[in-house]
Curated annotation (Swiss-Prot):
Name this polypeptide is given: Large ribosomal subunit protein uL30
Higher taxonomy: Bacteria, Pseudomonadati, Pseudomonadota, Gammaproteobacteria, Enterobacterales
Family recorded in the similarity comment: Belongs to the universal ribosomal protein uL30 family.
GO CC annotations on file: cytosolic large ribosomal subunit
Keywords of this entry: Ribonucleoprotein, Ribosomal protein
Organism: Yersinia pestis
Oligomer status and interactors: Part of the 50S ribosomal subunit.
PROSITE patterns documented for this protein: RIBOSOMAL_L30
Gene3D superfamilies: Ribosomal protein L30, ferredoxin-like fold domain
InterPro entries assigned: Ribo_uL30_ferredoxin-like_sf, Ribosomal_uL30_bac-type, Ribosomal_uL30_CS, Ribosomal_uL30_ferredoxin-like
């Protein structure tokens, strides 16, 4: 089984760069407090790093 991480949106995407909004959608996050579980891959880690100021990550 692949290792997973939990990603939770902690801040609003209103007024953010369009690229950052698209990254949140790509991660599957829709609203503040929404949590998704994703595979721990370099691609997902890169997306999380881009919007790290808006999300919380749990290993």
């Amino acid at each position: 089984m692949a290792k997973t991480i939990k990603v939770t949106q902690t801040k609003s995407s209103i007024g953010r760069l369009p690229k950052h909004k698209a990254t949140l959608i790509g991660l599957g996050l829709r609203r503040i407090g929404h949590t998704v579980e994703r595979e721990d891959t370099p691609a997902v880690r890169g997306m999380v790093n881009l919007v790290s100021y808006m999300v919380k990550v749990e290993e």
